[in-house]
Amino acid sequence: FTDQLGNIRFYDNETDNYQQDHYQLHWNEKISDKWNTNLAFHYTKGKGYYENYKEDAAFADYGLTPVGSEVSTDLIRQKWLDNDFYGTTFSTNYKSEKLNLIIGGAYNKYEGTHFGKVIWARFASQSELGDRYYDDFATKTDGNLFVKANFQLSEKISLYGDLQIRNVHYKANSLETGVVN
């Protein structure tokens, strides 16, 4: 950014403070020489923010009222996430001398609160400590099923097939994302 004396400067606390904790459970089972199964569950908790300096930011973009004739201000903002991501994957596998077959799928869900705060502004307008300039709860669900097969027709020729069906759904509504549904 450029300071009031015209010098190019960098914000000292430009930072990314985001943490994720991951938890997983895996189960593999050999049923016979030809059959086995795999099952996994996962959960990730994420929380944190990044902070940066915005030069000449429009008051309107932050839900703030202009101060006198000023329509913009330098400010420091934080963009926060507090989210959960969880799901499962599974498959059944068959393997013989001529056929390899995998049938499986997955289901995952993301749920996250996203919000932004102005923590400092050169012209403070009517903002209060802790005010949010956007606030959103977003979700994403993703489910799929698949079948993969490889059949050995001869020593040099094999036949391969892969089918998948997938459904993905997003939902969000904020100044940052617009309406997503």
Annotate each language-model stretch with its function:
Residues R9-E14:
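Active-site rim elements
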Residues N17-T177:
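Face-selective signature of the C-terminal outer-membrane beta-barrel domain
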Residues L5:
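The feature captures the short pre-catalytic strand/loop hairpin that immediately precedes
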